[in-house]
Amino acid sequence: MSTSSRQQSPAGGDGSTGGGSAAHCSGHAPVNALVEFLRTAPRTHTPEQLQAIARSSINDLSEALRALRTDLPKGDPVRGFLRANTTLALSLLNHAPRLREQLNIQPVAARLTGPQGFWSFGIRQRNRPQILRPPQLSRKK
């Protein structure tokens, strides 16, 4: 059914924008596109696939990953590059400007200016003591 919904929209011309938006309009088409993206090898991804992934949501990605984990047997070669494809899809989702607007990170970024802001958000200097005391200074004492 997802192929018929993609074939019904020839208005996109070369298919770079029209096919992705038509696939996004139907119910499970974004999840199906994500499953196809996650199943293909990372070297064979097309720019159209990458643009379609950037238009999907994080909920679609988690649903696609759940579907793949239940469908794939343990010896399947797709499991070898599933982690790389998931990382690529997450980076595409993070760079999408639509998701940046939904997250509204500006007030949080304003609070994170300076070391006091990082301290209040739980990044402690005790986790990296080499920043406070370089080895050259400790040898001179």
UniProtKB/Swiss-Prot annotation:
Bias-annotated ranges (Gly residues): 12-21
Principal subcellular localisation of the protein: virion
Alphabetically ordered keywords of this record: Capsid protein, Host nucleus, Virion
GO biological process: viral process
Disulfide bridge map: none
Domain of life from the UniProt record: Viruses
Stretch list, region Disordered: 1-25
Entry-linked InterPro entries: Herpes_UL35 (IPR007584)
Subcellular location: Virion; Host nucleus
Job description of the protein: Participates in the assembly of the infectious particles by decorating the outer surface of the capsid shell and thus forming a layer between the capsid and the tegument. Complexes composed of the major capsid protein and small capsomere-interacting protein/SCP assemble together in the host cytoplasm and are translocated to the nucleus, where they accumulate and participate in capsid assembly.
Homology family: Belongs to the herpesviridae small capsomere-interacting protein family.
Binding partners and assembly: Interacts with the major capsid protein/MCP.
Protein name, UniProt field: Small capsomere-interacting protein
Organism of origin: Psittacid herpesvirus 1 (isolate Amazon parrot/-/97-0001/1997)
